[in-house]
Design a protein with these regions (language model features):
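His-Asp-centered metal-binding catalytic motifs of divalent-metal-dependent phosphohydrolases/nucleases
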Residues: 30, 46-82, 86-97
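Acidic-glycine-rich active-site phosphate/pyrophosphate-binding loop
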Residues: 2-8, 48
Length: 198
């Protein structure tokens, strides 16, 4: 089950009341990219793509956490009965089915970590998981970013960027460009899209 677009926007607005920050605009940009790419692919549910892109970071509602936001989003969406969104909250950070490539602090309890590991290991990724992984990498708070520039920025901030994750993001870009037969930055309106307000 999925929330409607308006329900999803309300969830983000409510989340920003608890934890204001640029994550809300990042989510809007990810949703924009997901909608545009899904539409250009032709065989994806555009509304579903938008909603999943919008809510992938909803765990940020519960405060400033790194790996913790994955757990928080997963549990929160499960509690509302939005299992497809819960899955995306979990999978968007793990391109290669492993938490070893997570960039950021492991600020979770042992129990939370076990749940994340167990759920990631048994999850079968689909086109929407892959799409949101790509869109997470494309989305800045102010607009659409160049993927390599974004990964380099993360590498500078954290001191590393796992090569497997880097390669996976570039492969996702190539894959979806092949599906669309178009340049990803043109489809996502990189040079013209400006993230609005929620």
């Amino acid at each position: 089950m999925l929330p409607t677009r308006e329900e999803a926007l309300k969830l983000i607005r409510d989340g920003l009341l608890f934890n204001p920050g640029p994550w809300g605009k990042h989510c809007l940009t990810a949703a924009h990219c997901a909608e545009k790419i899904a539409s250009a692919c032709g065989d994806m549910d555009v509304e579903k793509a938008y909603i999943l892109g919008l809510l992938h970071d909803i765990g940020r509602k519960f405060g400033v956490r790194h790996l913790g936001h994955v757990y928080d989003g997963y549990v929160y969406m499960k509690s509302l009965g939005y299992d497809e969104v819960a899955k995306i909250c979990l999978t968007h950070s793990f391109n290669n089915h492993t938490i070893d490539e997570y960039i950021g602090k492991f600020d979770v309890t042992d129990e939370e970590l076990t749940i994340i590991k167990t759920e990631v290991a048994k999850t079968i990724y689909d086109e929407y998981d892959r799409l949101i992984q790509l869109c997470d990498c494309l989305a800045g708070a102010e607009g659409v970013l160049d993927i390599e520039n974004r990964m380099n920025d993360i590498k500078k901030r954290y001191g590393f960027y796992p090569q497997d994750k880097w390669n996976s993001n570039m492969n996702l870009k190539q894959y979806f460009e092949g599906e669309m037969n178009k340049d990803i930055y043109l489809i996502c309106e990189k040079d013209t899209f400006a993230t609005g307000n929620l």
